[in-house]
Amino acid sequence: MVSSNFYKNLGPRKLTAIIDFLHDIIAPPKIHEDIAIHDIKILQEASPNDISFLSNPKYSEFLKTTKAAACIVPKNFTGEANPNTVLLHAQNPYFAYGKLIDFFYTPIKSYPAKIMKSAIVADSATIGKNCYIGHNVVIEDDVIIGDNSIIEAGSFIGRGVNIGRNARIEQHVSINYAIIGDDVVILAGAKIGQDGFGFSTEKGVHHKIFHIGIVKIGNNVEIGANTTIDRGSLQDTIIKDLCRIDNLVQIGHGVKIGKGSIIVAQTGIAGSSTIGKYCTLGGQVGIAGHLNIGDGAQVAAQGGVAQNIEAGKIVGGSPAIPIMDWHRQSIIMKQLLKTSNSKLKK
């Protein structure tokens, strides 16, 4: 059940209007124009007034028993379904679901074009049109914030930082030494632009190296809660356009992440490594320093990468090896343990 404390339901919507809104839907030739859809629900919970979706074949069985008025299914779906449920075929049901959420819901919380009285904004800072600056925000000298941006309560924007248009910076984010593009979302607690972990050791003493690089973040990037992105020592830390970075990710100094890459929670990338375009790093992946991960490469969850990965390769395990080799090793290890246990029992 979606809580009305936080989200406003814009329904009901006519099913015919939903089909028009989604554009790329293949629907039955005749649909009654009076069918009204009140909400979006998972198959198991949907009522005759709801629409649902099927993007994972694991849930196909629920399509037989669902009470949903309509369901978005894959384009090539030919399985069984409740005869009372209208099937809407889509190339990407999950993408269609994402669009439907925007069609049905809007947050209750709004952000007026306003600087709250408790915010501290330097006289030399430039705040764009229609911006919201929340309670106890600190914006230092020479900061530039683009039009239509939101800076939520308790965030800190350090001297000289440049943030583009349509940014959404959630609560208690700190940003220093950074240039950030348009349409960027930074979730609560993220820390951007602090010193990297750089020391030189002389006679048993670890001497801190002053970092003179910055962080550059492209357009349409999302950075998760409590993620940390260090600025470079000499070279900049760079996050290219369209990247999606999950919560609790550590990105070291001088790291470069290519366009459209996805990095899942609790991953750590050591300094000066380069991640190519449209790469995927699963949860808890570790990337050693000064490595190159080629375009389109994928690392399975908990993979430990200690050497370069060629473009398009899929690896897993620690140390990471080609994914099929990792699967074979796992099977062999299981068999060896089984044999060993049998011998011990004898």
From Swiss-Prot:
Catalytic activity: a UDP-3-O-[(3R)-3-hydroxyacyl]-alpha-D-glucosamine + a (3R)-hydroxyacyl-[ACP] = a UDP-2-N,3-O-bis[(3R)-3-hydroxyacyl]-alpha-D-glucosamine + holo-[ACP] + H(+)
Active-site residues, record numbering mapped to chain: H253
GO MF entries: N-acyltransferase activity
EC code(s) of this entry: 2.3.1.191
Class of the enzyme per the UniProt entry, highest EC level: transferase
Database matches in Pfam families: Hexapep, LpxD
InterPro entries on file: Hexapep, Hexapep_transf_CS, LpxD, Trimer_LpxA-like_sf, UDP_GlcNAc_AcTrfase_non-rep
Biological processes annotated in GO: lipid A biosynthetic process
CDD domains: LbH_LpxD
Keywords, ordered alphabetically: Acyltransferase, Lipid A biosynthesis, Lipid biosynthesis, Lipid metabolism, Repeat, Transferase
Pathway terms, separated by semicolons: Bacterial outer membrane biogenesis; LPS lipid A biosynthesis
GO cellular component, one term: membrane
Disulfide bonds: none
NCBIfam families the record matches: lipid_A_lpxD (TIGR01853), PRK00892.1 (NF002060)
Function (record text): Catalyzes the N-acylation of UDP-3-O-acylglucosamine using 3-hydroxyacyl-ACP as the acyl donor. Is involved in the biosynthesis of lipid A, a phosphorylated glycolipid that anchors the lipopolysaccharide to the outer membrane of the cell.
Assembly with partners or alone: Homotrimer.
The family this protein is said to belong to: Belongs to the transferase hexapeptide repeat family. LpxD subfamily.
PANTHER family, alphabetized: UDP-3-O-ACYLGLUCOSAMINE N-ACYLTRANSFERASE, UDP-3-O-ACYLGLUCOSAMINE N-ACYLTRANSFERASE 1, MITOCHONDRIAL-RELATED
Name of protein: UDP-3-O-acylglucosamine N-acyltransferase
Provenance organism: Rickettsia africae (strain ESF-5)
Protein encoded by which gene: lpxD
